[in-house]
Amino acid sequence: MMTEKLNSGHTNLTSKGIINDLQIAGNTSDDMGWKSKLKLPPKDNRFKTTDVTDTRGNEFEEFCLKRELLMGIFEKGWERPSPIQEAAIPIALSGKDVLARAKNGTGKTGAYCIPVLEQIDPTKDYIQALVMVPTRELALQTSQICIELAKHLDIRVMVTTGGTILKDDILRIYQKVQLIIATPGRILDLMDKKVADMSHCRILVLDEADKLLSLDFQGMLDHVILKLPKDPQILLFSATFPLTVKNFMEKHLREPYEINLMEELTLKGVTQYYAFVQERQKVHCLNTLFSKLQINQSIIFCNSTQRVELLAKKITELGYCCYYIHAKMAQAHRNRVFHDFRQGLCRNLVCSDLFTRGIDVQAVNVVINFDFPRMAETYLHRIGRSGRFGHLGIAINLITYEDRFDLHRIEKELGTEIKPIPKVIDPALYVANVGASVGDTCNNSDLNNSANEEGNVSK
């Protein structure tokens, strides 16, 4: 009888063990199989520089993120964390304040979007996090990234900027959003009108913090912080750290974890050139560059809104597809241009410095400073529109006699090398799949033989 009971017990134990083993095997299979069901974008096989590949080898799974968030990350095409993501995500997830310096185009947006989305509770119908950015275009871009990352999470994301109808924003914010991406003026307006209830907002992100703390937004961030709960978690990201950022840090951040990945300021994948030209030769030089370079997409910078429109008209007259964008345009028009250029509907975009902050168009491989900037910071952000996320690109500066001192000063301030444009620009420096013929190389002699071409753009 005892033997039968023991055998019966053994049989039950064995059966339970088999069932447990099968359940574990099923769970393991499920753990391994969810990735195979993802709708992944085509793999990006382009060469990447150490700006984004010099990591410790961590995987996104090691951050213990929700599976739904991981699904969004992988379906976005992000395979492994970049250095700034690897450094910032685990610290931000711990609840500490973060002060992060990293180059443009190395994954800063993901470095704060991922921990913010992970910490939001989808079951709570109130604003839990606020991301502030300096421009409307950057707000739209950031909100789109958050929406894509959160596609499998039940998190409601809202973008609010100036230039749009305030009534529409008020109606949307009453639909119980949990994450807001905003420009300073508009979110302050919503707070002052008692529409945006920030009493439960525990996370504040400041992207492009040096710009947010400039004279353009003087004092706005202090007003925003006054309307948040006491001691919110602050994640502060910037490529440059002027005195205003340091003062803000000392005033509002609590023992922040400092990350500095700025051993050098310029992206390793961007090769910089200059060409000495007369003002009246610039359009002809631009025409030469268009005809000789293998341009995927290009951004051409001018120093004033008037020159932006005039140059865009000249380029169109030369027979090239060209959009333009600047701060004085209607917001709806700006949104359309920004969207269509990102979709690749036009190869060339002429713009003012509106387009220098954080804007990510990965197809851009050529940046041209039609007008050379006066400030090193502006130059740094302009050329950072090419060579995004470790890819290759070139920056070409058209330098007049009056620009020569600014050229040498900026080169010295940034600790970088801006080379004279060579007789031949090697396509391997900026073309993903090099298949260049002789006609695809750019001759500096062509640039210098432009004295007979007027092509003048009035100031």
Swiss-Prot record:
Residues covered by region (RecA-like domain 1): 1-267
Phenotype of null mutants: Larvae lethal at the second- or third-instar stage. RNAi-mediated knockdown in adult pigment dispersing factor (Pdf)-expressing clock neurons results in poor circadian locomotor rhythms under constant dark (DD) conditions. The axonal terminus of s-LNv neurons display a loss of Pdf circadian daily oscillations which is consistent with their behavioral arrhythmicity. However, there is no effect on the daily oscillations of pir and tim proteins in Pdf neurons. Double knockdown with Atx2 enhances the behavioral arrhythmicity.
Complex formation: Conserved component of different types of multiprotein ribonucleoprotein complexes (RNPs) that form distinct germ granules (P-body, nuage, sponge body or polar granules) and P-body-like neuronal RNPs. Consequently it interacts with a wide variety of proteins, some of which appear to be common interactive partners in almost all RNPs types i.e. cup and tral, whereas other interactions are specific to a germ granule/RNP.
Record-given protein name: ATP-dependent RNA helicase me31b
Record-level GO cellular component terms: cytoplasm; cytoplasmic ribonucleoprotein granule; cytoplasmic stress granule; endoplasmic reticulum; neuronal cell body; neuronal ribonucleoprotein granule; P granule; P-body
Function comment: ATP-dependent RNA helicase which is a core component of a variety of ribonucleoprotein complexes (RNPs) that play critical roles in translational repression and mRNA decapping during embryogenesis, oogenesis, neurogenesis and neurotransmission. Recruits core components and translational repressors to some RNP complexes, and mediates RNP aggregation into processing granules such as P-bodies. As part of a RNP complex containing tral, eIF4E1, cup, and pAbp, involved in RNP-mediated translational repression of maternal mRNAs during oogenesis and embryogenesis.
Mutagenesis or variant effect for residue 310 to A: In LK-AA; reduced interaction with Gyf, Patr-1 and 4E-T
Sequence ranges assigned to domain Helicase ATP-binding in this UniProt record: 89-259
Reactions performed catalytically: ATP + H2O = ADP + phosphate + H(+)
PROSITE patterns found in the cross-reference section: DEAD_ATP_HELICASE, HELICASE_ATP_BIND_1, HELICASE_CTER, Q_MOTIF
Binding site for ATP: 102-109
Organism: Drosophila melanogaster
Annotated region (RecA-like domain 2), positions in chain: 432-459
Enzyme class: hydrolase
Predominant subcellular localization, coarse grouping: cytoplasm
